[in-house]
């Protein structure tokens, strides 16, 4: 029994979790510490059928770690100096090409059975530093060095007056990546060992042998430049590690292609505080589960049996990030994660890691006194900058674990983690529960095999495989920043609301097939962004519509807001209804003939023809001026039922509101705010003037002149404007209307005399015009109105 493994986390051996579990074996895993188990002969026998009903009872609470002492100012200074030295030491790591990692992750030989069997062998040879010559860290650096230094045969790479062979470049690369030296001979020996069982693999041949065509064409040429040295001489804008921080969020949003008429995609970030978001980024991950023999070091490289071990790089996942919605049945597999995603008050602002664990079970019980070890490490330190964001200063680390079977909760535990002094956090993964589970599964398998019935053995194996397929887990790691700790000191024992979610781990399990090695892969999951920050997806049957240009928007804005001309009676027809938005109905049938004359009484065809504006109710309100859409789509006007004046000025036209929404836009206009609604009707055409007119006046044809005589309702007069304009805000005095007769005195000859008809003919044309209301002020006695609106 190992009593020296994490002595501060020892748990009593007579706890309820160690009830009898089997009737066939005299050995079972016994919990001794947080993540280490030991085999013991002190467990009694019991039935196997009680296994499924016992798992939900096991919940362990570990004691609090020692209270952290506040760091002094010199201590903080030393940390900054250490981080600076660490950054200087690993500065050249940025020279790694961005494509080397992706190519290495796709190498087939890393997933081959022979390579995995070689890596799971115990490492017996140690270097001068007392560590295995090719540990997992060095093996990962070695694989990166193979990608960064292409094969060069017997040629050399010259730099600073010295020649380097490929093995020397690989050894130098490993030293700069890990800080551990391996000689040229050690690199050569390791290559020979790997080549003995990887020879013939296309990916391996590409890394160790130079193509024949390239070798024959460059016999007298120089060796190919190492990729990482070329990158140093010609630095690029992004590096391998520099572009690693949250690559999924930017790439995912960049892949969204907007279509015509759509809003631009927003800048998507996780969380409101950039520094806190970067602090919760996981830069390294490690997970192993193994059994150590008695009197043997409790390490994965000395393991008696490895249930699973991390596959690939410790600092980079093997698979690219994947949207959370692409995980089949993630809501039923991870109910706790689903509740976090649906919580709008506490959005996910940390990394979500998906771990797919393949477990290789033991065929028999291990020797008495063996121990189960589980190593789970999360590294928040940047590979080159270290702990510059102060993750090691965070306190009150907690870990909650939820284990499910077919969406039914089997186990729920909460643990307080000891304060970390580095950037690595070691969450607990319920090793006692796993020890009991492995013992019971092995017990069932032995009972089935000893029965002599092959079908019973197959049923036991199928039962175990089905159990692992239905098994899932969710872990949430939280911590409190130093600033939150200082604020929470005012309230004794109250810091739960101040904690920050640091990571969410989603676990899926399966049992390996015969002959396979247990491996674990990890990848980041991208939660669906909030609906308020992204555009609605484009429907499959959508039709692209040309967006309005800026010129059309500006042309619809009124040019003079201070001058108001009194409208004509035919333009101001009042409808006895409530206040609604005003829409321009039609253009004037003809312009005022009197405007053809300049003030001197001469005909002037070079000047523009001025026309009185439609009315006060057609003015654009302030809210629509602030909106980015054209006023012609959904104009807002002063909601006034009538315009009242003491001088007898005519009133304005009020019509019912038309719910016209542009089919290509998702906005509707109102007086209070603009609400986003999905477009539902695609049959409305804004340019269909007939449908708009029929909505007001019916489908029958009627002269517009008759409309002002028989279908208009006139209201009383007042000097106030109700609606959008508050009482007392504006006062509109009107000047008395007067008509200025048009003088037709003798005119001076000008350059258009040859083009115009004679004066007698013009007199006949003008004299025959009547002064009736049907002329709308265009008769010979008509004048022009001159009224202004002054804002008080």
UniProtKB/Swiss-Prot annotation:
Basic residues: compositionally biased ranges: 83-94
Subcellular location: Nucleus
Stretches the record annotates as Disordered: 61-134, 213-272, 708-732, 767-792
Gene induction: Expression is positively regulated by pcz1.
Transmembrane domains' residue ranges: none
Entries under PANTHER family matching the protein: PROTEIN SCALLOPED, TRANSCRIPTIONAL ENHANCER FACTOR TEF RELATED
Protein name in UniProt: Conidiophore development regulator abaA
Organism, as annotated: Penicillium roqueforti (strain FM164)
Lineage of origin: Eukaryota, Fungi, Dikarya, Ascomycota, Pezizomycotina
């Amino acid at each position: 029994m190992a009593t020296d493994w994490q002595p501060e986390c020892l748990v009593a051996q007579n706890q309820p979790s160690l009830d009898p579990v089997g009737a066939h074996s005299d050995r079972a895993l016994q919990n001794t510490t947080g993540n280490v188990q030991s085999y013991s002969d002190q467990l009694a026998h019991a039935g196997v059928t009680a296994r499924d009903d016992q798992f939900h009872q096991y919940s362990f609470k570990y004691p609090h770690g020692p209270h952290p002492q506040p760091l002094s100012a010199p201590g903080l200074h030393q940390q900054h100096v250490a981080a600076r030295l660490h950054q200087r030491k690993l500065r050249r790591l940025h020279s790694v090409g961005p494509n080397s990692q992706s190519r290495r992750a796709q190498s087939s030989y890393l997933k081959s059975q022979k390579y995995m069997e070689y890596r799971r062998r115990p490492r017996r040879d140690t270097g001068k530093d007392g560590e295995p010559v090719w540990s997992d860290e060095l093996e990962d650096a070695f694989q990166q060095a193979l990608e960064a230094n292409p094969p060069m045969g017997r040629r050399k790479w010259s730099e600073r007056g010295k020649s380097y062979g490929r093995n020397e470049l690989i050894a130098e690369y490993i030293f700069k990546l890990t800080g551990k030296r391996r000689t040229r001979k050690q690199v050569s020996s390791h290559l020979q060992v790997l080549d003995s069982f990887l020879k013939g693999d296309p990916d391996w041949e590409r890394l160790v042998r130079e193509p024949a065509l390239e070798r024959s064409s460059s016999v007298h040429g120089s060796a190919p430049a190492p990729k990482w040295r070329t990158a140093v001489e010609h630095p690029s804008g992004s590096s391998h590690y520099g572009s690693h921080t949250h690559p999924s969020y930017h790439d995912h949003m960049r892949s969204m292609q907007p279509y015509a008429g759509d809003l631009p995609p927003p800048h998507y970030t996780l969380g409101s505080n950039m520094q806190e978001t970067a602090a919760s980024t996981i830069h390294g991950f490690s997970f192993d589960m193994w059994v150590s023999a008695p009197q043997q070091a409790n390490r994965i490289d000395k393991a008696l049996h490895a249930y699973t071990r991390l596959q690939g790089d410790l600092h980079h996942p093997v698979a690219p990030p994947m949207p959370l919605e692409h995980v089949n049945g993630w809501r039923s597999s991870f109910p706790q994660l689903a509740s976090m995603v649906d919580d709008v008050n506490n959005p996910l602002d940390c990394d979500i890691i998906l771990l797919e664990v393949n477990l290789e079970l033991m065929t028999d019980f291990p020797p008495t006194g063996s121990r189960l070890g589980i190593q789970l490490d999360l590294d928040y330190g940047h590979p080159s900058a270290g702990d510059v964001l102060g993750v090691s200063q965070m306190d009150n680390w907690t870990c909650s674990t939820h284990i499910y079977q077919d969406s039914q909760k089997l186990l729920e535990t909460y643990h307080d983690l000891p304060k970390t002094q580095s950037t690595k956090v070691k969450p607990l993964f319920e090793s006692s529960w796993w020890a009991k589970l492995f013992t019971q599964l092995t017990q069932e398998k032995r009972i089935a095999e000893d029965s002599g019935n092959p079908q019973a053995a197959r049923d036991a194996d199928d039962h175990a495989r089905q159990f692992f397929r239905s098994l899932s887990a969710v872990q949430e790691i939280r911590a409190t920043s130093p600033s939150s700790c200082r604020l929470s000191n005012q309230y004794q024992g109250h810091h739960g609301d101040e904690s920050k979610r640091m990571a969410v781990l989603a676990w899926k399990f399966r049992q390996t097939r015969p002959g396979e090695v247990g491996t674990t892969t990890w990848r980041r999951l991208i939660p669906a962004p909030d609906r308020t920050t992204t555009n609605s997806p484009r429907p499959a049957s959508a039709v692209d519509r040309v967006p309005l240009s800026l010129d059309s928007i500006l042309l619809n804005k009124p040019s003079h807001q201070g001058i108001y001309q009194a409208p004509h009676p035919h333009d101001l027809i009042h409808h006895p209804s409530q206040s609604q938005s005003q829409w321009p109905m039609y253009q004037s049938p003809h312009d005022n003939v009197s405007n053809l004359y300049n003030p001197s009484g001469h005909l002037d065809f070079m000047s523009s023809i001025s026309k009185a504006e439609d009315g006060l109710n057609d003015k654009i309100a302030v809210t629509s001026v602030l909106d980015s859409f054209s006023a012609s789509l959904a104009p807002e006007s002063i909601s006034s039922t009538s315009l009242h004046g003491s001088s007898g000025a005519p009133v304005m036209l009020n019509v019912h509101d038309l719910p016209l929404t542009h089919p290509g836009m998702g906005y509707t206009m109102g007086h209070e705010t603009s609400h986003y609604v999905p477009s539902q009707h695609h049959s409305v055409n804004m340019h269909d003037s007939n449908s708009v007119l029929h909505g007001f006046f019916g489908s029958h044809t009627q002269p517009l002149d008759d409309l002002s005589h028989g279908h208009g309702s006139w209201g009383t007069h007042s000097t106030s404007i109700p609606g959008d304009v508050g009482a007392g805000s504006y006062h509109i005095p009107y000047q008395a209307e007067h008509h200025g007769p048009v003088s037709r005195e003798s005119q001076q000859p000008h350059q258009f005399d040859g083009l115009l008809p004679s004066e007698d003919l013009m007199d006949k044309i003008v004299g025959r015009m009547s002064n009736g209301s049907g002329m709308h002020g265009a008769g010979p006695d008509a004048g022009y109105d001159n009224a202004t609106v002054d804002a008080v």
